[in-house]
Amino acid sequence: MQTADDPTGTTVLGMLNNCGNGRTPWGTYLTCEENFNGYFGWNDPAFTRNTLEARYGLSQTGFGYRWHTVDPRFDMGVNRNEPNRFGWIVEIDPFNETSQPVKRTALGRFKHENAELVIAPNGRVVVYMGCDEVNEYIYKFVSAGTFDASNPTSAANRDLLSDGTLYVARFDAGATAGDRMGTGTWIPLVFGQNGLDASNGFTSQGDVVIRARQASDRLGATMMDRPEWVAANPTKPGEVFITCTNNSRRGTTPPSSNLADGTTVAGSARPAVDDANPVSYTHLA
């Protein structure tokens, strides 16, 4: 997160490619950074992207905006860490013009579409999210603290998104093939657990959330077909609906998956049609 202009790695100038949204019961707005990779590139032909950059789809020319040709901030050959400062959920207080937006890094870095926030029966804040790209994953964040409904705008409530556990979803087919039924598991993305440690190249919890895609690869999360909008049933805790846009690579050959070592280039895998992801059934296309 550290750059020459921000040696502390704590102050980021602006947001990129804000997509969907969310709202909190304490009166703030959540905006979602999505296709941030398209704004970066590099000018040095000798520059080579690393596995993290490839996994997030960063490329020499980006989306053709050419920002990197006029502003060194967006030239990865000059400021390699700058892309890591984008791809976050940003919390904004629209009712306080002096407030400073906060990138809630505990919620993970990926191509956020929206942020569906609910209060669980135990009082914890839960945020459901999808990474809007083919072969990517569904996530949820659960706060460490609980929501104080008696004082919704309290300072304690306003800090609930800074501390908690990020999870990624894995779906498994049921016992009967073709019945479109199955089970789901939320796997914690926590440094030191489930192989997210130094033996697999992870150095801290900060490293895990910056590399959320690669951490999810390591945990065997289920590849989805652009998990876009997420909505929760307010009358039935735990019931969540997810719209997936498309995946032209699903079912093509040769089949492949996002590799556990995190080296798969973004969007390049060819997942098979399977019962764990019934939306991919060809007869529903």
Question: Language-model features: where?
Answer:
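Beta-rich catalytic cores
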Residues: 17, 85, 111, 226, ...
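Short loop/turn segments immediately following the C-termini of beta-strands
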Residues: 34, 130-132, 245
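Extended catalytic-interface subdomain
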Residues: 91, 134-221
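Conserved small/polar residues in nucleotide/adenosyl-binding loops
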Residues: 282-285
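Short, conserved, GDST-rich strand-edge loop motifs in beta-rich repeat architectures
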Residues: 37-80, 143-146, 246-273
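Signature of short aromatic-glycine-proline-rich micro-motifs recurring in repeat-based ectodomains
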Residues: 9-20, 218-229
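Entry beta-strands of beta-propeller and related beta-repeat scaffolds
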Residues: 28-29, 123-127, 237-241
